[in-house]
């Protein structure tokens, strides 16, 4: 090694952990590199790994899975309020469970609908 490299190595040996961390950050910033990519060491020789980005689902279907006989009226009221269906249509939907009651709703709204159904005594799921 050259004398210059030896001097740099000796200087690096004297750095505290905090100073070393700051140095890494500064090198990443200055040279637009990511030090965490090289941490794998031998893994890098295996070839580039394909990383698939997992998208978080934003729309959900609310499914009415099961309605106990003694909770049918309470669940029927919740289904009517969630769907806007008439009494006859909501009754048919509740009696034909498992059935989808809402489609393509936001996560918060879907979780709230599921909670309402479960609070009324039914079983619901999100898909």
Curated annotation (Swiss-Prot):
InterPro entries: Ribosomal_bL12 (IPR000206), Ribosomal_bL12_C (IPR013823), Ribosomal_bL12_C/ClpS-like (IPR014719), Ribosomal_bL12_oligo (IPR008932), Ribosomal_bL12_oligo_N_sf (IPR036235). Disulfide bonds: none annotated. Coiled coil: none annotated. GO terms for cellular component: chloroplast; cytosolic large ribosomal subunit. It is found in: Plastid, Chloroplast. Residues 104-127 are annotated as: Disordered. Residues 105-121 have a biased composition (Basic and acidic residues). One of its GO terms (molecular function) is structural constituent of ribosome. One of its GO terms (biological process) is translation. Keywords: Chloroplast, Plastid, Ribonucleoprotein, Ribosomal protein. Forms part of the ribosomal stalk which helps the ribosome interact with GTP-bound translation factors. Is thus essential for accurate translation. PANTHER family: 39S RIBOSOMAL PROTEIN L12, LARGE RIBOSOMAL SUBUNIT PROTEIN BL12M. Belongs to the bacterial ribosomal protein bL12 family. Homodimer. Part of the ribosomal stalk of the 50S ribosomal subunit. Forms a multimeric L10(L12)X complex, where L10 forms an elongated spine to which 2 to 4 L12 dimers bind in a sequential fashion. Binds GTP-bound translation factors. This is Large ribosomal subunit protein bL12c. It comes from Trieres chinensis. The lineage of its organism: Eukaryota, Sar, Stramenopiles, Ochrophyta, Bacillariophyta.
